Amino acid sequence: MSAAEAGGVFHRARGRTLDAFPAEKESEWKGPFYFILGADPQFGLMKAWSTGDCDNGGDEWEQEIRLTEQAVQAINKLNPKPKFFVLCGDLIHAMPGKPWRTEQTEDLKRVLRTVDRAIPLVLVSGNHDIGNAPTAETVDEFCRTWGDDYFSFWVGGVLFLVLNSQFYENPSKCPSLKQAQDQWLDEQLSIARQRHCQHAIIFQHIPLFLESIDEDDDYYFNLSKSTRKKLADKFIHAGVKVVFSGHYHRNAGGTYQNLDMVVSSAIGCQLGRDPHGLRVVVVTAEKIVHRYYSLDELSEKGIEDDLMDLIKKK
């Protein structure tokens, strides 16, 4: 079954937008809401990491299935329901053309089909989803499987932009696709400026930076200095408040001028000391408040009262 046939939860992005949120109904502020952010379920990485062969390993992913099922069950129990559930890339571990890619994809679809149908999915492309050096073919495969690789949508007067960050990391095999996203992004940021939206929020897989705009190039976990600065300045000029990313498999982040960079750890394999988890993000008229929960915490206790008070505030 393809994502399109799965229906319900798979409101796949098409035409650079998400039909789960019609713009004409969602362009005005209606009051506080929240969403759930996850990153890097990356079916197969835990086995590959444990064997020390991240390039060719990953022939088992039962642990990731259980963790993602736990994440979905925790989300489904939440009341009130989140506006959406966003996955910030690296949905699976097997790169394009590698063994087990089809099987990992089908298993993830099966788990995601159990998300409450009232909670749309927002899917972000990661480097493992489209390759470290994406091509027109790998991007097309992602789009056919999961929906557009970049798009925008409105929720209650807030503009959300989903970006394909691999175009900023290595566009050498698809320069025209990168150019198209650049042009589209400029148009979207112009809309954000002109419309004076309540907030503008960006989702992308690779962080601009892990702690500081001036940190050294990591050559893997952050974008290059010149790229990150150019993007961050663009975002700030348009009034973007926060960029959410995954990729690092640890919690991290920092602030540049008035732009927050939030790096959220993984549902799947942890590369640091954080627990497997999800981030609760509350959007109020004045601010964006977020907190990382372990899957166990969210499953057993739900969202804490101080955040619930913000969500219910009129």
UniProtKB/Swiss-Prot annotation:
Reaction(s) catalysed (UniProt annotation): O-phospho-L-seryl-[protein] + H2O = L-seryl-[protein] + phosphate; O-phospho-L-threonyl-[protein] + H2O = L-threonyl-[protein] + phosphate
Coiled-coil segments: none
Enzyme Commission number(s): 3.1.3.16
Modified residues (Phosphoserine): S2, S294
InterPro entries on file: Calcineurin-like_PHP_ApaH, Metallo-depent_PP-like, MPP_CSTP1, STPP_CPPED1
Residues given in the record as a divalent metal cation 1 binding sites: D53, D90
Record bears the keyword Cytoplasm: yes
Cofactor(s) required, per the database record: a divalent metal cation
Keywords, alphabetical: Cytoplasm, Hydrolase, Metal-binding, Phosphoprotein
Co-factor remark: Binds 2 divalent metal cations.
Compartments reported by the entry: Cytoplasm
Residues at which a divalent metal cation 2 binds: D90, N127, H247
CDD domains per record: MPP_CSTP1
GO cellular component terms, A-Z: cytoplasm
Family classification: Belongs to the metallophosphoesterase superfamily. CPPED1 family.
Identification of the protein by name: Serine/threonine-protein phosphatase CPPED1
Origin species: Pongo abelii (Sumatran orangutan)
